[in-house]
Amino acid sequence: MLELDYNLTTLEKIIAIVADYARQGGMPTSYLDKMAADLIRIHKCEPAFLGFTPTGKAGLGGYPAVMCVSINGEVIHGIPSDDKILQDGDVVKLDCGIKMPDGQYDDGATTVLVGDCSATARKLVKSTKEALEAGIKQAKAGKTNHDITKAIEAVAKRDGFAVVHGYGGHGIGTELHMEPHIANEMLYKEDGETPVDEPVKLTSGMRIAIEPMFASKRGFVKTAADGWTLQIIGGGIAAHFEKTVTIK
């Protein structure tokens, strides 16, 4: 029986319950989406992802589900389906967002292993989770978004994994996606020392979603034919964790 930590947020409890079912395998990913929808309603929240249209996706009419369920080489934004059945050995990313009764948003994700997974998969998931923890340690007033980025990137380098290029965390509050961007890797100008973007100082009360995404081989990605699912190019698997934190 799943025992939930009372210190978990509403969203973390929802994701933990869905994850407990997902790791058993044998069910379609659409079942996990329906479960998330039911739990969100029970907690008197609203699904943040359903109908959400991020920058560059205006022509798609909004995301069609409550939860993103991405398998193996899929990184994020996988659309739940009756045809996608979780199998032994799958690496499953569960990403969900809610709008709470007070009007604030929350965003979170976890990666679960179904059955007997490879040593690489286990190490990748452990590394990505540790990167999240390293990033959270830097999420303090007076620090910058670059401090979080460097902490996440250092874990990937330590463990020999690739950071998924071009994606990362974000500010969150009365909107799902807000400034600042929390990158998972530092990008520098031609001199190799000057960051491409200016650091943003973290201030007390600011809420940010930190979300490392690592790949077992290369970090280059493409969008699948469905217009949403982000896939690793050249094979391999990916892991993704996310937590919304308040700066103190």
Language model features with spans:
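Active-site neighborhoods and metal-handling regions in enzymes and metal-associated proteins
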Residues: M1-K248
